[in-house]
C-alpha cells in the first residue's frame, strides 16, 4: 500500500470516527455468512421507531475485482464493481442503481507518495462531475473537494482542507459549504496500549453566526471492550460500550441524553453484527 497524504476524505477522519462512529440511536442487526465458493452474504435489519428497513447484500471477490450487490426493502438493486490496482496506486469503481437510470457513475482513485486523487463522473447526458485532490506527505496535507453540475454550469460543492499529523496528534482545518462554514478538529492519542484518545471538533457557520463544539474520548477496558463518550455545546451527552465477543462479531449499546431537558426520555441504541 502506498503511504502518503491519502484521499481528501481522510482529512479529519480520525477525529470524526472518534466523535461519531458507532453511536446508534436505533436498533440494528447484521449477519454475515460465507458460501463454499467464497461469496459473502450479509442480511441487515434496522428498526427506526415504527419503521423497519432491511436489505440483503452479496460480495464476490475474483483476483483484484470485487462485486457488491445489495437489494433493499424498496426493491432497489445497488451494484458496485471495484477493480483494485489495474495500475500501481489506481482503483476503478463502477456503480449503478436499478431502476434509477441516472445513477450510473464511474470513479477513479489514485494514491501516490505525495498525492491522492479521487474523481467521478455520472453516466448521463449532463453529468455531475466530482473531483478531490490532496497534495503533501504523511505529516502535512492540503486538498480540495469540488462538484460541478454540467446541466446548470454551477459548482454545487467547493471545499478545502488542511491536515497536520504526528505520531500521536492529528489536527485539521476545513472550509465547507462554499466558504460558509469552517471546521477545526483535533485528535490526540493519550495511551496507545489502551487505545485511549481524546478528540474535539469546532464548527462555525458564517451565515447563522453559530458555533458547535463537540468533544469526546475513547478507552479500551480490555482487549475486546471499548467505551466512548462525547458531549456537545448543545448539552447532548452520549456514551457507548462495544464488545467484540468473538472475532469480527460486535455488540454495541449506546445512549444519548439532553442535559438541558433531563425530563425527556434518553435515546438508547443497539447494534449487533455477527460474522463467522
Curated annotation (Swiss-Prot):
Instruction: Show the InterPro entries listed in the entry.
Output: Porin_dom_sf (IPR023614), Porin_Euk (IPR001925), Porin_Euk/Tom40 (IPR027246)
**Keyword NAD appears in the UniProt entry:** no
Q: Name one GO cellular component term.
A: mitochondrial outer membrane
The cellular location(s) given in this protein's UniProt record come to: Mitochondrion outer membrane
The family database entries (PROSITE patterns) matched by this protein are listed as: EUKARYOTIC_PORIN (PS00558)
Q: A Gene Ontology molecular-function term? A: porin activity
Q: Give UniProt keywords alphabetically.
A: Ion transport, Membrane, Mitochondrion, Mitochondrion outer membrane, Porin, Transmembrane, Transmembrane beta strand, Transport
**Origin: domain of life:** Eukaryota
Pfam families recorded: Porin_3
According to its UniProt record, which protein family does this protein belong to? Answer: Belongs to the eukaryotic mitochondrial porin (TC 1.B.8.1) family.
Q: What is known of its domains?
A: Consists mainly of membrane-spanning sided beta-sheets.
Alphabetized PANTHER family for the sequence: GH26960P-RELATED, VOLTAGE-DEPENDENT ANION-SELECTIVE CHANNEL
Q: What does this protein do?
A: Forms a channel through the cell membrane that allows diffusion of small hydrophilic molecules. The channel adopts an open conformation at low or zero membrane potential and a closed conformation at potentials above 30-40 mV. The open state has a weak anion selectivity whereas the closed state is cation-selective.
Q: What is this protein called?
A: Mitochondrial outer membrane protein porin of 36 kDa
> What does the organism's lineage look like at the top?
Eukaryota, Viridiplantae, Streptophyta, Embryophyta, Tracheophyta
Amino acid at each position: 500500500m502506498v503511504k502518503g497524504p491519502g484521499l481528501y476524505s481522510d482529512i479529519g477522519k480520525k477525529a470524526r470516527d472518534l466523535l461519531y462512529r458507532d453511536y446508534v440511536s436505533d436498533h440494528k442487526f447484521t449477519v454475515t455468512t460465507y458460501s463454499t465458493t467464497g461469496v459473502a452474504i450479509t442480511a441487515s435489519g434496522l428498526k427506526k421507531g415504527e419503521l423497519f428497513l432491511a436489505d440483503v447484500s452479496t460480495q464476490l471477490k475474483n483476483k483484484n475485482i470485487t462485486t457488491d450487490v445489495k437489494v433493499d426493502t424498496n426493491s432497489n438493486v445497488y451494484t458496485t464493481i471495484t477493480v483494485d490496482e489495474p495500475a500501481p496506486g489506481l482503483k476503478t469503481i463502477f456503480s449503478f442503481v436499478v431502476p434509477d437510470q441516472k445513477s450510473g457513475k464511474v470513479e477513479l482513485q489514485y494514491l501516490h507518495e505525495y498525492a491522492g486523487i479521487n474523481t467521478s463522473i455520472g453516466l448521463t447526458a449532463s453529468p455531475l462531475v466530482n473531483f478531490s485532490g490532496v497534495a503533501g506527505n504523511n505529516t502535512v496535507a492540503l486538498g480540495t473537494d469540488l462538484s460541478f453540475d454540467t446541466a446548470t454550469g454551477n459548482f454545487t460543492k467547493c471545499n478545502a482542507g488542511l491536515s497536520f499529523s504526528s505520531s500521536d496528534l492529528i489536527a485539521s482545518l476545513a472550509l465547507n459549504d462554499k466558504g460558509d462554514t469552517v471546521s477545526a478538529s483535533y485528535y490526540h492519542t493519550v495511551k496507545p496500549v489502551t487505545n485511549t484518545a481524546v478528540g474535539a471538533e469546532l464548527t462555525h457557520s458564517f451565515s447563522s453566526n453559530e458555533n458547535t463544539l463537540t468533544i469526546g474520548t475513547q478507552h479500551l477496558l480490555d482487549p475486546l471492550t471499548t467505551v466512548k463518550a462525547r458531549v456537545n455545546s448543545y448539552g447532548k451527552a452520549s456514551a457507548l460500550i462495544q464488545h467484540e465477543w468473538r472475532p469480527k462479531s460486535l455488540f454495541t449499546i449506546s445512549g444519548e441524553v439532553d442535559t438541558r431537558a433531563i425530563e425527556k426520555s434518553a435515546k438508547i441504541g443497539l447494534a449487533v453484527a455477527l460474522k463467522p
